[in-house]
């Protein structure tokens, strides 16, 4: 067969036919042919070659010491020692190398006494160190020589994989033979490669199937490694490269059955093992590597089990390790955890699971005995495809691993049979190397079946199970994923393993990866290969000196005195040379994360970043190379990657550069990972070696780049203090690292027995610690601490905590180690969090404890070692804490610890590529990936499971100034005085920002009013507790579900109603409606007492400071004088309430604006939402009617101080039954000359008479909040205007007189009584009051009485008021002359505004007015103003800003409020809607059942009950009404303290229930704000466009940006804006598939611009769908618009009909019979007046919406310029087509559009209709009437389709009597005088006017279908309904579904003239019910029926 050498390789490869078995250490290892590897890594090889100086990409430096694990798992010492050029190799062959070989051979031979096959630790023998390290010529092909990856790795050393090392196929000799510990590992032959003096295994032990594949695996349980995608073709020539040639067959050692079990662990191993067991090693050698070997049955793939399970070994500390990704091997069943503490168990493991046994038996026959095997010449056997696939990438050394494992396990002396060793080790599931774990449970080498948690993501999760193997056993070197454990069996060192931290303790050095040329002197003759973590073959191939092995010269702290090779335990990770094996640092220090782990510890399946138990977490191989096909990827790459760039993968917690590994760890790694490191660039390796040697005070002269194969011989006794880890990281498995490790191992020898014993303990410890450490590693990224040791020592490994005893030992060791480390870097190494758990197995307590307590003197070279030896990582697992300064963990950065301290980064391109592929920039560890299943693919590659991609979430671009103001508003920061100029600039900037947002709010409200109707504030009944429960129920679900849940709760726990309430329900109430939706009830208005810092020095024309100073305390007489007015109010209320007919209210509209606040000069700027203000000489003031009790409060605002007038006359009782319904004297109302001005007497007799200039005074338009919208005087005034204040006026118990106290400047409080004008349903007649004028607006819709009567009654009422007011003429006269400026008192109480917004207001020339209440007058009403000053805000917060009070302390707030205000009795308007006491006593399940339909019911039930329990506990009862009187900030803090309420929920309660200034941002608001461009976003990824966003910024961040800009708006504007926004989000701007083409805001919308640009540029123009302007004719039924100058927002028709009285013109004719006037057209609305069009148009006319095409064009152009890369000229082309008729985007066709909604024609029932007898009386403020839906003849309640004809009655002339017969029933009903119908109830009336959050759950035009009449329709005589107007009702499952896909006109029509209905309602139980099928049959049910 052709030689497998690559043409580029300058060294000889062994042809297959010549690849007989090589005799190594007395054992014959058959050459297992390897499937040719893909050339993926060729480039990398080339790079490596270049770096290494070998054009072939692989250097054949065969120095014995330099030998590193070959791809096959053989240590190619030469590869690592010095990758020499061909010339050097040749020279070495011819000269020194050969001599070195012979010397090393002699030394090794001299070691023949070493019997422990598991501990081939090389002792410092007389053998020449150089030869060991020296590069053997390829001719010699010396196994001992650096077993270069002769042909295996095409990629080069950098590509060298752990798998390759472990892959038995590629190993020319079995790992066991390498490990077998004769004094001389190799026998020098005169011909061919040296042969081992002794078999590494017990010849008497039966051969195992895995024997063939156990080459390198024997020490490690093989875990199917994740194949590296890069290394598909690497394996092909590996064996050839490794073994130069050997014409002689090497007798194949017979492997023990125990080894067979080891082979079971991997499919490849099993396959090869079986083949070898068949005696087909020769066949294997004959196999053509270029051909795919014959695949074994797919069953074998099962052997790629990710977990190594040790049965019977319970985890000592069950942990939830971050699970590693599981490798799923097709056809390979998961192995069951095996308990193999005993040999018997091991035996069971030998065969693996029963299935594996069957497979193996069927596949191959076991050789009779080992001897036979050894005698047999290797024959090439065809491997199964599976095997080929496995070794292809995943398990290069699997097949041989089994053999090597078995061989390794066996003592060279035969003292311990391999099977015995395996038994001792404990059966591992064989994930990595069953044999390894089985090698010797006693050795503890068997990794606990737990794979190291650190294992890379590629590693199967089963590694964790692997821990099971070792549980009972002390896993010597167990990487979580690595199941292979390489018990170094050679010598039975008697020192306790526990003390031994590393087998290979380089006395002076930590073993980084001192492979290759490093430490030529460190030939570990007896060294046993360190455990190669990951996919690597065992790092320690016995043939080469292993750093893992303690150098012979080095004395172990324990019985290390025997320089016998120490068996590597996980515990005995490579202890630093300083550390005696007995030293506490021993095993734990050795523990290294595989990624950054010492290579010696790398286990085959272990992913980089994984830790071997004994290893200290360095760079976790796992994290390093999760994606590598073999799970190990290139060991050196992985290690190097992890080592050199541990920081590359932030997620890999245990990524500690290999440099961090302890020397011993390094040595182990060197042994274990030497092969893997071989791939690393030689140059990096060389530099590493150099650093190491320098640290040791001698420099390795060999440079890979130069091709110097030999290093200068170093004194064997001298240890290299190489910063192996750092360098190793750089070298990434470079030879240098290997040599270092080797040199270190030379100095350390361990007794196999002791190591085994310790390993067992360690393994036990590791079983728990591995998982823990891995978890910890994941949780805490291993921090890189670069130790600047003079020697460039690698950073210390993370300290692992052991038992206290362990800690003591470790402390000692670490102390020594730390010394050196500390020299370079005094700063202590960062320790991983205690949570981290080291994989390092605890050293056996029995031996180690004593040792721990004892300080072990460092070896001779300890000082050197200390310099660079890291202390073991500190993990919760290992309790031992390193003592001394050396605590720096190897976690340190991968920087080399060499004197330069630089990290050599000479990586091949392949390595760089690999590292980049594995680069992870996330902040979190990829725990999910580690837990993920990895799919097995036919090519053998293991691909990590890709978790769901997280959808990108954009972030709001918030500037610092916004954050500052937000903090002030939230009370989180104090205002600091700054530069005045800067402050002024900021103030101007904020003014501009707020002006822009006022405009946006006004524009949005106006436009939405045109479409969605009037949604201004209208108070609902309900308590504060109702709203808190309501916000609980509204979280995370749509409003219709939330409202139904509350209704269900109310039905299940109905409130206890008093008889009076029941009586009230049946009393016909007066309907008072006003466009402002304001119904003020003085009884409900609490008094607010607060100090308001107001701008001072606010001079008003005509009011000088002197006049202000004249203010004095007023006497109480002023209040008494107001009594007459109070009486008149009561009389008027009685008269109005006596009316039995509903009527439209007379509205006294304030001059203030309806919409948002604006600047003082912006009155005409945004007229759409504001009423026109009339300024009359004096003051302009407007009064508006209020709630049913008709009491209203007037906000006195402006530059004039109110005066109190007195009068004592009684008001005549006037009959006002129908007065309010009249429309008389509108002109008079409008032309009132005088405004009612209320003054405040300075004292009983004196009145201040200073006249003031005109000012605008705004009447309150909200029940409890006075909106002072503009107190700028004639354009002058505060820098901010339209401040809203919310004085709350409570009627005193004895007197209904609101009292207000003002403190002006520093004067004493002034008292004035805010006058209350009795408001009636009709307009107040003009009242002539000298000196003042007030404009009163009234709008009345159709009434049942003629206008003349109305005018007469209005006149009569006017006289009444005139009389009333004339009685106090004198007072009023004085008042007119004593106008006072109360502007200062009108500041908003909330810091909504100026203060926070304008921090400089404190310095302004405004005078501070403090509003205080007299504590003695608790019963009297007071006005509290919302402060805007930052100072006041801070005062209000008090200590609340510091933090939330304990719940028990909140009652003090209630007491303060009630103490100041007095406990207010609850009235009918704030009563609870639910019996909360019953809920509190109910069980959680009962509450949960009531709200089950909503979802999340269990959690909410708990929260609701906890909330009720809390308020009862804190306050003694369920009552939070006191929050209405509490300061807004304190109320906010209190609500936030409730569990389950967030900022959005609290803001909802405050705005909608407490009527504070707040603006909640829910999902609808946030989404709209982003799409409209109101909130700036940080740049989005190029691939993501705005219209493709699925996630939006966090709501709180949106609120953080919006609130500082909206905080100056008044409460009414905020309410309407919020209500319109949430409705807009449900109707148009839905989360998915928004109705952009019908959206009236699309002209300004960024979302639409993005979608439009994308669609227009990528798709053909859609069909022209013009958004026709609304041309719906106005029905003749409606009255023409009434020209009321002050009325801006006439009510739509449905409101006019709310009274139940049809219009005069149409009350006699059905609407259907009147033809529409086609000729009538809406008045064309120009662009300028679009926003206020509806103010002056017919209230019944639907306004026209016109798209602002210019604005759209600008928005589109801006979007395209910013976000799209267009060619020159594309922009103009793209915008050419912009036209209103084409401004649409393609939309997906809606499915089941016919099922989204169902339209029904219904009749409108007046309130007095006979059908409503017995029904609840309609609520006064309910805009919707009762409706009647008529059934189609033959229709049933559940009929979803029109009834079908069921008889032929028509033909016969006779009708059937079948109720379901459509035809007959239609004829019958047509002839009958009755029809069937279902009642529809207005939602507000159905809920009796009480609902949480002010009823915003519902639409203003929402109805409920009466459930009873839905099931059994009522019979209605036709003559009852024939003349009623008709309406359209849309039925559906939700508001969103009803409006989906409708055009703008259709949506407009629904809101203006139609109604929506989404649920039924059962009146008796008051519970919600689903709609019956006849009303609406949803598509979801239709689908179910079909199925």
Swiss-Prot record:
EC supergroup of this enzyme? hydrolase
The entry's free-text remark on the cofactor is: Binds 1 [4Fe-4S] cluster. The cluster does not appear to play a role in catalysis, but is probably involved in the proper positioning of the enzyme along the DNA strand.
**Cofactor(s) listed in the protein's UniProt record:** [4Fe-4S] cluster
Upon changing residue 1562 to N, the result is:
Loss of activity and abnormal MEA imprinting
| Top-level taxon in the UniProt lineage | Eukaryota
Tell whether GTP-binding is among the UniProt keywords. Answer: no
GO cellular component, as recorded: nucleus; polar nucleus
Q: Where does [4Fe-4S] cluster bind?
A: 1629, 1636, 1639, 1645
Q: Known SMART domains for this protein?
A: ENDO3c, FES
UniProt cross-references to Pfam families, sorted A to Z: Perm-CXXC (PF15629), RRM_DME (PF15628)
Q: Which family does it belong to?
A: Belongs to the DNA glycosylase family. DEMETER subfamily.
- From the Swiss-Prot or TrEMBL record, give the protein name: Transcriptional activator DEMETER
What species does this protein belong to?
A: Arabidopsis thaliana (Mouse-ear cress)
What is the taxonomic lineage of the source species? Eukaryota, Viridiplantae, Streptophyta, Embryophyta, Tracheophyta
